């Protein structure tokens, strides 16, 4: 779990996302509260429930980007899902409980990676010994036991030195490595996961833990043997317990496009992918127990962050019970031309930086001037105002149109330098920005 302070989290988010300070503060506080809760005594910790968040704002202002960046910062089980993917229980489609199953899978993978990292040094030592045994089989005595001699030991040290220096990487050896497990995917109806897991376990046990002799280059054999030895050093049952504990106490679920499951007006017949999904989300957010292939998972302390543009629907169109379970409301603001200008230059790996790097691969130098960047930002903002406002995503469309000619001719213009100034931007984009019909269909 991340131990970053709210200020540090906001600072890290600022490196990738422009503006939206209120949203950043809310998610930073929510993330820090996960850590604070874990410092409490057990009796009080159980009572402290997460304050779920509802982010409201037009499309393209950074809601999903905040989720993406938060996933990297959290160092905890994190999953982002689209609300529109789910249907009510009993109908064809994914049910909302699969969110927790997927989150548990993420946690198991994360815990497994962390455990493998801890034993990596020991696994490398064991893998090295197995490769040296394949290169220099130890001599055996009359009883078939390994016999160590000074000469053998010296030769082994010479080979060990060469192996560590990478001088033997391309040499081929024949070695026993674990055969890949037979993957059996069984599709089962909702609620039958336990039976599916038992069948999968049965098929895998039939295959057994067989090893197979393979001819590999030493560098490839070394990687395979490290994984094999590390897996032997890790207790899989303990890993599952740790993963479930991590999900229950540190798990974060980000539900995007929640406005798309709001009920719109009066409609007859069952609303299986809208209000039905909202009702199914209630017990999950309030706290329930979900059966997964790794064990039972309680959702009482999982943090839920929901987001939606709410351009057609309103937050009040969500069913009242769900509104009550998302107590923290954050409104994200629409982006101005000044914000667009900052987006083009300030974030790490900004759009302009990406295009400069891409063209550099063709030995073409690109320079964006200050007035050129201002003109690009103005063009994107103007098109958003006159047509549909799609936020920062408009910059991708505008930049592609602007760089179209240079990108196409880059191979023939190797060694050339292009300066993207206001005049060049006006020449390439002027007619599209000024003509509403052209901007509507092309930009």
From Swiss-Prot:
Compositional bias of kind Polar residues: 145-156
Subcellular compartments: Cytoplasm
Protein source organism: Vibrio vulnificus (strain YJ016)
Annotated region described as Disordered, given as residue ranges: 137-156
Keywords for this protein: ATP-binding, Chaperone, Cytoplasm, Nucleotide-binding
InterPro entries: AAA+_ATPase (IPR003593), ATP-dep_Clp_protease_ClpX (IPR050052), ATPase_AAA_core (IPR003959), Clp_ATPase_C (IPR019489), HslU (IPR004491), P-loop_NTPase (IPR027417)
Binding annotation for ATP: 18, 60-65, 256, 321, 393
Matches recorded under Gene3D superfamilies: 1.10.8.60, DNA helicase RuvA subunit, C-terminal domain, P-loop containing nucleotide triphosphate hydrolases
Annotated function: ATPase subunit of a proteasome-like degradation complex; this subunit has chaperone activity. The binding of ATP and its subsequent hydrolysis by HslU are essential for unfolding of protein substrates subsequently hydrolyzed by HslV. HslU recognizes the N-terminal part of its protein substrates and unfolds these before they are guided to HslV for hydrolysis.
Family per similarity comment: Belongs to the ClpX chaperone family. HslU subfamily.
Stored NCBIfam families: hslU, PRK05201.1
GO terms assigned for molecular function: ATP binding; ATP hydrolysis activity; peptidase activity; proteasome-activating activity
Pfam families (alphabetical): AAA, AAA_2
GO BP terms in the entry: protein unfolding; proteolysis involved in protein catabolic process
GO CC list: HslUV protease complex
Subunit relationships: A double ring-shaped homohexamer of HslV is capped on each side by a ring-shaped HslU homohexamer. The assembly of the HslU/HslV complex is dependent on binding of ATP.
Official protein name in the record: ATP-dependent protease ATPase subunit HslU
């Amino acid at each position: 779990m991340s131990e970053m302070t709210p200020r540090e989290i906001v600072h890290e988010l600022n490196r990738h996302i422009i503006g939206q300070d209120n949203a950043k503060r809310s998610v930073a506080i929510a993330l820090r509260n996960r850590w604070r809760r874990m410092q409490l005594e057990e009796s009080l910790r159980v009572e402290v429930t997460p304050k779920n968040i509802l982010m409201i704002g037009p499309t393209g202002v950074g809601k999903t980007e905040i989720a993406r960046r938060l996933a990297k910062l959290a160092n905890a089980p994190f999953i982002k899902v689209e609300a529109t993917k789910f249907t009510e229980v009993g109908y064809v489609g994914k049910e909302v409980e699969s969110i927790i199953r997927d989150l548990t899978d993420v946690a198991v993978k994360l815990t497994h990676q962390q455990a493998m990292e801890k034993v990596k040094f020991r696994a490398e030592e064991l893998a090295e010994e197995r490769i040296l045994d394949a290169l220099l089989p130890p001599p055996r005595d009359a009883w078939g036991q390994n016999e160590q001699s000074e000469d053998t030991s010296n030769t082994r040290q010479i080979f060990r030195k060469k192996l560590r220096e990478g001088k033997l990487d391309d040499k081929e050896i024949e070695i026993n490595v674990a055969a890949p497990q037979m993957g059996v995917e069984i599709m089962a109806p909702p609620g039958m996961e336990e039976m599916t897991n038992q069948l999968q376990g049965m098929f895998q046990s039939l295959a057994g833990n067989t090893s197979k002799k393979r001819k590999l280059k030493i560098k490839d054999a070394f990687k395979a043997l490290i994984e094999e030895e590390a897996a032997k050093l890790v207790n899989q049952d303990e890993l599952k317990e740790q993963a479930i504990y991590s999900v229950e106490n540190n798990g974060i679920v980000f539900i995007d496009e929640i406005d798309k499951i709001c009920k719109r007006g009066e409609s007859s017949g069952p609303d299986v992918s809208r209000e039905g999904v909202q009702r199914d989300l209630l017990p999950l957010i309030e706290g329930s127990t979900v059966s997964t292939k790794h064990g039972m998972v309680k959702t009482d302390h999982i943090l839920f962050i929901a987001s939606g543009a709410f351009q057609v629907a309103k937050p009040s169109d969500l069913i009242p019970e769900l509104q009550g379970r998302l107590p923290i409301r954050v409104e994200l603001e629409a982006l101005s031309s000044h914000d667009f200008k900052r987006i083009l230059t300030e974030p790490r790996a900004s759009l302009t930086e990406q295009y400069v790097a891409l063209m550099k691969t063709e030995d073409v130098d690109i320079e964006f001037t200050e007035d050129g960047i201002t003109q690009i930002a103005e063009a994107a903002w103007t098109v958003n105002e006159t047509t549909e406002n799609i936020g920062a995503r408009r910059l991708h469309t505008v930049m592609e149109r602007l760089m179209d000619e240079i990108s196409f001719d880059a191979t023939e213009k190797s060694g050339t330098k292009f300066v993207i100034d206001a005049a060049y931007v006006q020449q390439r984009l002027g007619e599209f920005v000024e003509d509403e019909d052209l901007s509507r269909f092309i930009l």
